Amino acid sequence: MSESEIIWFIFILISGVVFLTYFIQVRRRRVKDEKRKKEAESLGTDKPLNQYPQIDYYRCIGCGACVRACPEGGVLGLVHGKATIINGLKCVGHGMCAEACPVNGIKVGLGDIKTRDDIPILSASNETNLPGIYIAGELGGLALIKNAITQGNKVVNDIIKNLGNGSSEDCFDVVIVGAGPAGLSAALTAKQHNLRFMLIDQQNAGGTILQYPRKKVVMTKPVEIPLFGWLKKHEYTKEELLDIWEEIQQKFQLKVKTNEKLENIEKMNKKYKLTTKSSTYLASNVVLALGRRGTPRKLNVPGEDKSKVMYKLLDAETYQNEDILIVGGGDSAVEAAMGLARQPGNNVTISYRKSRFVRIKTRNEQLISRMIDDRKITVFFDSNIVQIGDRDVTIKNDQEEFSIPNSYVFIFAGGEPPLPLMHKIGIKFGGELESDF
């Protein structure tokens, strides 16, 4: 064999080994994605709640760029050579998958919502089937701070176009329900155009951000806040965002009427009467800038009414040398558990009704796994809370019922979105948009 033949033989051999190695890795990854897809379908986690990537399978070339671009991890995978949604519940709609696709084969949106009984039917201007009642923010199905701010501005601009002769002393141009990013944006736009408006919320300004644990990092995209200016960074901590909301309120004298939980909206002579727990308001238009979390979901177990039971963690540093139980397995639960486990002397336990964490971000999954391996956090999967005592909690799993010492219980079982209220008002979900007037 000549020297050139030997060189070609070695080249072909090395190329074959490299190709075979690559083929095996790709094959393993795709088999793994197929398995994850089937598991997600069986658990019901394949279906997204908000906006999600809609993949054009005719354009998709199976390059995996979208899979690698997703910052949440685990949302997308490659099955049968095409990109597909694996864990839709993890998707929050960043849209980086669409930006990364080299063939423009992905759009991020809500898709066909005709069968979605949790998404209200909205016009292009975010108006419901009830003329003058608008929805802005995640209640309409679009997550992310940027979307909320943009929609808050958009709906009030549409109200301005259709505003009649103006308000009277007993009637507002618009009442804005919810003081999160969407509500604050709507209020700033109303102030910018000298509308007579009222901004109300059942808690303080901040919306869903108030529920986040201390120093939680929130991803967003650059967006312009009416009157205030641009949010230019891609990441903010909870505290940074709340400082911005506080600065906005002070700078523009934006008053939020707190402790006003909306109970009903009724039509009154082409106006709307809003009833809260403590007040009534009359308005020509209404902006519902409510979050999807709504009222915290309860376990309905004995002892849940004790003062040591809470549904949100504001500052982990205030809890030290305590026996703490976290109930739930989503990102909020995991982040709270990790924050508390980092405090001196805490003994942190998680009780989760499923067999493993299925909804959390990849970064959280890696961090919590490490802390469990290091025995900084104890987890009881496939378990439920039976009873909450003064100094202990009774837990039941498939094998036994047992008690653990306990000082505090944090329940992160999700929230009950305000869908019954919206049905009561007359807002339609699914089907075709029809006017009731």
Cite the ranges covered by each PLM segment:
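A Rossmann-like FAD-binding core segment of flavoenzymes
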Residues: 46-47, 215-222, 230, 235-283, ...
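Short Fe-S-cluster ligation motifs
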Residues: 89-108, 124-139
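FAD-binding beta-loop-beta segment adjacent to the flavin cofactor pocket
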Residues: 67-69, 113-134, 214, 437
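Rossmann-like dinucleotide/flavin-binding elements
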Residues: 125-202, 312-357, 420-424, 434
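Non-ligating segments of multi-cofactor redox enzymes
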Residues: 1-59, 63-68, 78
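Glycine-rich beta-alpha-beta "Rossmann" dinucleotide-binding loop(s) and their flanking helix/strand
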Residues: 74, 105-119, 279, 286-313, ...
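Ferredoxin-like iron-sulfur electron-transfer modules
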Residues: 39-62, 75-93, 113-124, 139-140, ...
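Iron-sulfur cluster-binding cysteine motifs and their immediate structural context
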Residues: 65-82, 96-113
